[in-house]
């Protein structure tokens, strides 16, 4: 090692989040340029970057020295009090963060020391967390000191803090304590020089302690960025952290620009004369540090599955698969099943994975045993018969042509990957079960790192430079960026780099940068921020399991808000060392299915078992063929619904195909339309080559001669080239990677195989030219089949139990009012009336009531789950509410709240009590005040104290409610305010058909993605939530929500348009708008350029349509069918239903949502359903 060199040991990478600005790859490039033999990493309180740092170091050929700048509690780590050592006048010199911590620098000398650092950083989070700091203490470090080198740390260290406070004796005692804990050879006196007074004031005191205790000096540089010119990026990053601007004189900042990787010459110039040996100590430590390779050595850390005596894991797997086949096939498995299961088990055991299958099966079977709904299978695992027998999947792979080799085969070297879908609301229970089963120290969720991406970097940069006005500037810049592709924006460097593939698309934003100096400043700073880690999060589904305590292998942290244990490394780093990663996915549609089944049981008394539902239900395929699949899993979007209408599915294989085809690749080659046209005889099925027509007939028959699935490519290679399915899977992967040299090699073997089977060169080339591009987008049929089954189940529920399914669907969308509006409109189309919330009838969520749906109280603004729970408990215990007075008398103090009561009034939840909404609104505040005092007294037992112990009656209040009522228009506006949409009626009822005649695009069509960016459209509806604003130049503009009967969309009226139409942009105005569609990220909106207020003043309401029905015909199914007929003919005519029972006739006025347009088609539909006499007098 060059003795004139230097090793930087105290460095903060970007994993010191929003404090360190040193990215690891550039850091090693600079260390290499400086010809330094090693470099350290000491991030603040965590070891999140250790894996990336180590692997980057090994690639660069530079020795990694991994450590941590630890937070040390001033007392016990368990003590959450802030402890200071000086008097109040010394606050600036005292323990950091008002008494929270001091610092200590620690690095691992070897693999054992590194594992001890993992334990220390983990336990600091588990036991020493105070606010955002994970703190250790002397006791903990003493327990895990082996293999660790410690220094006195930065100026915030314990020894330096004591010296600044004038506590010289305590400083000496502190240094002696740490020296004793870690050993005299492992303790160093850390010295820094950034020209700061806090460094200079204690230097002589430190050196004196070093001389007295024989502690060698160590020079460090507290690096926070890689090179000197990155100081501005670091200043900007600190402003992102603190929310300050660069112009703020009081912002947190580092003084000077010396916190970078200085050269050896720079460091030795600082220290060699003043403190000889301080730089040499860095080389000494670097030489002492041994390889950490053992920490990253891959090893089998899969949990050992417990099996009965007399079995090993392989034999128990065979036993469980055999038992599973008997459960699946009580009359005995069909021919070939036992043989295939045996083959699969042989492969699983030969690859060493029997425990993995047993673990997954245990998880799935536990979920089912406690009523947690599990998906039927996802990914290639659905191709495994063993998985089907074990209950891991619920789709039999053999009749669907699914291949085990696509999932696992003798040639595969990596772990199989079985992902599991659970009911979204109960995923957390499964994580807890895994921890209970395998040990809480051996199971953890997985960390993710949120980085500062392109748009965020621009917005952060604009704010820190220009404050509040910067938001508008950033908006202008981000709107000029080219559209994101697959949710990824162009990197900022690509905007000005002609070599970047999207350079030409960035001309607009590049022009801004070149012509506007403010934009150029924002851009330059943003480039320094882009890509830096902003925060740590938790992966949505990944869970790590281990056979040993996880802290033996990786660092962990405890999420403060909920105590969840999280890995300190992302899942690829965990998998690389042999830890088992599983995905526990929360699937919302399983929650919807579960709610729908519960609704069916409650509403109809039917216990529905979806697994037993036949896959040939006619009503389901009729629904699919109509494209009535809003809310159906994977089939919800507008273009998908159009494809279903073209395709007219008639069997489950069509559903599987549509999921595989509706993706950019196949659609780009028009394969989706080709499939639909060939299925419906609109296109001739052509063979790939005459020689191949017969050999490939069976393989391609199900997809009408098209290659749709990866499994088909594998079967083709097996059939015509003599490949094994394992080798065919290797071919499939090679084709997907598109590497020329690999493809040439594969084509050679493929061609030889086909020639050996008698195929001509022309046939070989024709087939290769077809399967090569198809391999790039051909879909995994196993995954499509598993998800296709969920699609079928949800379609089946909607087709056969529409009310119950839609209630579950509406509950699932929660606060997404745009989705709720679309689904409510779909309910009307299906003849389902959505009833408003009701204090006497509603529960928390949407609920099916006969053929209708009742709004849940939990969907009312300002009404939380606790209030609803209290209200329902009261209703169950004391009976339904007779009137508003009875309601106030019965409810407990939880529900007795003016804001809650007002919200329920506006939402119409008291309508059934016979009061007007306005009347209740006028008296509710005084009424609540009147009863509140009594209820508070009841709650603390005062009535008992003053003579109420004999069980006397409660105090009773009577409130007189005025009869005054708001106009319908105002009632509906308030209803929308509370519910986010109109429920009991709609301001457009009676004129919607007139409005629809003047538009060219429906709002749901835009929201479904059926209209591309920048398209001009004409839409109509009613304005709501009008928000008038002023831009940075003081010019007014507005935004609003435009609602029609089917949905709502945001419309922006920018200054030019606003200046012409501002007077008409008011709440509740019915308008027609010409606008441009704007698609940005996941947000779709309209930019208006013209507005028209149509005149409907002379519209005459059509004469009511009278429909007669015998009371004995009033069955659930008949009424539901009638609603569907009426919903198919929307219009302005009221419908009167005449119920005939003998001589008695009862006339009901149907809901406004069921108004119709009288037409011969409607009359024919009614007569077909109810008989020819239904329209007579």
Swiss-Prot record:
Subunit: DNA polymerase III contains a core (composed of alpha, epsilon and theta chains) that associates with a tau subunit. This core dimerizes to form the PolIII' complex. PolIII' associates with the gamma complex (composed of gamma, delta, delta', psi and chi chains) and with the beta chain to form the complete DNA polymerase III complex.
NCBIfam families: polc, PRK05673.1
Domain of life: Bacteria
Family label: Belongs to the DNA polymerase type-C family. DnaE subfamily.
Gene3D superfamilies linked to this entry: 1.10.150.870, Bacterial DNA polymerase III alpha subunit, thumb domain, Metal-dependent hydrolases
InterPro entries named in the record: DNA_pol3_alpha_NTPase_dom, DNA_pol3_alpha_thumb_dom, DNA_pol3_finger, DnaE2/DnaE/PolC, DNAPol_HHH, NA-bd_OB_tRNA, PHP_dom, Pol/His_phosphatase_N
Location in or out of the cell: Cytoplasm
Natural source organism: Mycobacterium leprae (strain TN)
GO molecular function: 3'-5' exonuclease activity; DNA-directed DNA polymerase activity; nucleic acid binding
UniProt cross-references to CDD domains, sorted A to Z: DnaE_OBF, PHP_PolIIIA_DnaE3
Enzyme class: transferase
Record's keyword terms, sorted: Cytoplasm, DNA replication, DNA-directed DNA polymerase, Nucleotidyltransferase, Transferase
Coiled-coil portions: none
Any one of the GO BP annotations: DNA replication
Disulfide pairings: none
EC assignment: 2.7.7.7
One Gene Ontology cellular component annotation held by this UniProt entry: cytoplasm
UniProt-recorded name of the protein: DNA polymerase III subunit alpha
Pfam families in alphabetical order: DNA_pol3_alpha, DNA_pol3_finger, HHH_6, PHP, tRNA_anti-codon
